[in-house]
Curated annotation (Swiss-Prot):
This is DNA repair and recombination protein RAD54-like. It comes from the Eukaryota. SMART domains: DEXDc, HELICc. Highly expressed in bursa, thymus, testis, and ovary. Low level of expression seen in all other organs tested. ATP binds at D172, E173, M174, G175, L176, G177, K178, T179. Keywords: Acetylation, ATP-binding, DNA damage, DNA repair, DNA-binding, Helicase, Hydrolase, Metal-binding, Nucleotide-binding, Nucleus, Phosphoprotein, Zinc. It is found in: Nucleus. The keyword Ligase does not apply. The modification Phosphoserine is found at S561. Residues 1-35 are annotated as: Disordered. One of its GO terms (cellular component) is nucleus. GO terms for molecular function: ATP binding; ATP-dependent DNA/DNA annealing activity; DNA translocase activity; helicase activity; hydrolase activity; metal ion binding.
Length: 733
């Protein structure tokens, strides 16, 4: 060990601080100056450029000397200014796209023209267009038809399909992923363009109120945390106005919530606030709501300041030519001219050519104008059918089940036909639209006599003395399935399904009163159920659907009011669906039936469409399936019946055929059946989208594929049409 000197220096001359005296406790002896120090402690080294003792002025001077040293750029020979924000040298070169267009599986929406080496030298580097490539996060999950759809949408809204027009109609059938395609379009437009900057700053989705939360969830699902949508699904008028004004005032590249999701009703009520700003793109879900250009919603949306419009409609565009015009005019104003020009150039010649008394020249002119119209519309409309789904989804078996009326229903039905005024008026050749509300009474009677019991008690028109027909002691407090043919069949279907499988069932009806009966039946049978109708809040709907779809959920039945937003709901937790009553508009029934057979479904799906044999329900169903010419249109409400039915057809509505096993089968004059029994199978290649005459026809249960319906046959089934979506599952789900 080095010997230490008294002054704090060692023999080798190294400096160390002198020893300091520690404060001693009172009463203790002071230590000597030469106190013991550990020989292992390393001595401190003095800073050569720092004074030994610093006063405040010296300290300040020392800090200033450090800060005043010039900043040295860590790049050799760099002579540029150091005060700019840019770090390092800006490298000259062409701009690059956001995602690699040459990566395997890349979905390229725009490919810039190739530049020669000479052109690359001459062109302004900041003006060279770049590839527009869909984010790989989305392109990896898009199916082939969806990739094609996204390309079509992008071409339309960027005016590449129709110069000067920026709109299109996405009319794919239900279940083909229209929502995902539109989310992909929005995300691409919000992030990139050929000009190497976002094409739009903001997008807006307008949908039925029941789908606002669904859209929000879908954006979250596919984009994760990459974007924060704003969904307006509740709150006071002032609160909603404040949110909307704030959203419309947002501008720039970094808008906090670039996607606004709002319902048609809220949009209409707050149109003034929304029209103060501009939006890069508006998407209208369930766009067939805009088929009437006179209604307030159409006009409010049409006045929104937006160049790009996409209209989604899974429902086939109805056969009314004016609906064609309204929808196309909304997305691409002017491509079909004004309403008057459209009527003169297209509608009148086409309708005249369709007339039974048209001359050959008129017929030919009508066909030419129709082809011209279709060629224009097809430039901004894309439609694919659900046939594509057969590659990805399990088999769907669709069944139209005719159920005989019970004796009570038959007596009440005949009693009504004898008394009701519409029947008398029709015999005299008169049509009173207001009296046609009695159609609703007949439809409810077909569901269950309990639904018209109050009318019988009050002896309303058509139900005089009908109370005597009910069994003694009858009460509406308890459901009695044996009093309704359809309810009896439903009771069997539910019981057999519950006892033989772990399948779940969706029950759909047009009437909330019928849902009340379903509830009573479920309570009697101790089935767990959930119910969605117009009284349920939007937020609660989303939670109920999510819970029902969970495999661990104990609910067996999901009750759905078709009027309360059946469209857009994803109910893949169930694989059996019962349409308890038909709707005048086939689109409504199609919407409801598409709830279970859609992306994510793993089980074979069974659809049951129940009809009361020989009644008004079969007439409504025939109306749905009958292929009409362009001049006819679909009945939306019962008040419109007079406009769509001839006197003879109306007379037929008010009739009951008690001897038939299926009035619908009688009407199609089937050549494959002998004495009601099918002797030849359906044509090869036919499926459940084919005409009803090409389905399987069963007058007994021998030809049925569904074991559940076989077990329920003897309850009250008289006849069944059935067919499948495809032979077997193809491809991978």
């Amino acid at each position: 060990l080095a010997k230490r000197k008294a002054g704090g220096e060692e023999e080798d001359g190294e400096w160390r601080p002198p020893a300091t005296q520690k404060r001693q406790k009172a009463g203790s002896e002071a230590e000597s100056a030469d106190c013991y120090r550990s020989p292992f402690r390393k001595p401190l080294t003095q800073l050569t450029n720092r004074p030994l003792c610093l006063d405040s002025s010296q300290h300040e001077a020392f800090i200033r000397s450090i800060l005043s040293k010039p900043f040295k750029v860590p790049i050799p020979n760099y002579k540029g200014p150091t005060g700019l924000r840019a770090l390092g040298i800006k490298r000259a070169g062409l701009r690059s796209p956001l995602h690699d267009p040459f990566e395997e599986g890349a979905l390229v929406l725009y490919e810039p023209p190739l530049l020669s080496a000479h052109e690359q030298l001459k062109i302004d580097k900041d003006k060279v267009p770049v590839h527009v490539v869909v984010d790989p996060v989305l392109s990896r999950v898009l199916r082939p038809h969806q990739r094609e759809g996204v390309k079509f949408l992008w071409d339309c809204v960027t005016s590449r399909r129709i110069p000067g027009s920026h709109g299109c109609i996405m009319a794919d059938e239900m279940g083909l992923g229209k929502t995902l395609q539109c989310i992909t379009l929005m995300w691409t437009l919000l992030r990139q363009s050929p000009d190497c900057k976002p094409e739009i700053e903001k997008a807006m989705v307008v949908s039925p109120s029941s789908l606002v939360r669904n859209w929000y969830n879908e954006v979250e699902k596919w984009l994760g945390g990459r974007i924060q949508p704003l969904a307006i699904d509740g709150g006071s008028k002032e609160e909603i106005d404040r949110k909307l004004v704030g959203s419309m005032n947002q501008r720039g590249l970094r808008v906090p919530s670039p996607i606004l999701i709002i319902s048609y009703e809220t949009f209409r009520l707050h149109a003034e606030a929304l029209q103060k700003g501009s939006v890069g793109l508006v998407i209208c879900d369930e766009g067939h709501r805009l088929k009437n250009s006179e209604n307030q919603t159409y006009q409010a949306l049409n006045s929104l300041n937006t160049p790009r419009r996409v209209l989604i409609s899974g429902t086939p565009i109805q056969n009314d030519l004016l609906e064609y015009f309204s929808l196309v005019h909304f997305v691409n104003s002017g491509i079909l001219g004004t309403a008057q020009e459209f009527k003169r150039h297209f509608e009148l010649p086409i309708l005249k050519g369709r007339d039974a008394d048209a001359s050959e020249a008129e017929r030919q002119k009508g066909e030419e104008r129709l082809k011209e119209l279709i060629s224009i519309v097809n430039r901004c409309l894309i439609r694919r059918t659900s046939d594509i789904l057969s590659k990805y989804l399990p088999v769907k078996i669709e069944q139209v089940v005719c159920c005989r009326l019970t004796p009570l229903q038959a007596e009440l039905y005949k009693n009504f036909l004898k008394q009701a005024k519409p029947v008398e008026e029709l015999k005299e050749g008169k049509i009173n639209v207001s009296s046609l509300s009695s159609i609703t009474s007949l439809k409810k009677l077909c569901n269950h006599p309990a639904l018209i019991y109050d009318k019988c008690v009050e002896e309303e028109e058509g139900f005089m003395g009908a109370l005597d027909l009910f069994p003694a002691g009858y009460s509406t407090k308890s459901v009695e399935p044996q009093l309704s043919g359809k309810m009896l069949v439903l009771d069997y279907i539910l019981a057999v399904t519950k006892s033989t499988s772990n399948d779940k069932v969706v029950l759909v009806s047009n009437y909330t009163q019928t849902l009340d009966l379903f509830e009573k039946l479920c309570r009697n049978r101790r089935y767990l159920y959930v119910r969605l109708d117009g009284t349920m809040s939007i937020k609660k709907r989303a939670k109920v659907v999510e819970r029902f779809n969970s495999p661990s959920s104990p609910e067996f039945i999901f009750m759905l009011s078709s009027k309360a937003g059946g469209c857009g709901l994803n109910l893949i937790g169930a694989n059996r669906l019962v349409m308890f009553d038909p709707d005048w508009n086939p689109a409504n029934d199609e919407q409801a039936m598409a709830r279970v057979w859609r992306d994510g479904q793993k089980k074979t799906c069974y659809i049951y469409r129940l009809l009361s044999t020989g009644t008004i329900e079969e007439k409504i169903f025939q109306r749905q399936t009958h292929k009409k010419a362009l001049s006819s249109c679909v009945v939306d409400e019962e008040q419109d019946v007079e406009r769509h039915f001839s006197l003879g057809e109306l007379k037929e509505l008010f009739s009951l055929n008690e001897t038939t096993i299926s009035d619908t089968h009688d009407k199609i004059k089937c050549r494959r059946c002998v004495n009601g029994h099918q002797v030849r199978p359906p044509p090869e290649g036919s499926d459940c989208t084919s005409d009803l005459s090409q389905w399987n026809h069963c007058a007994d249960k021998r030809g049925l594929q569904d074991s559940v319906l076989k077990a329920a046959w003897d309850a009250a089934v008289t006849f069944t049409f059935h067919h499948h979506s495809h032979e077997e599952q193809r491809g991978i789900p």
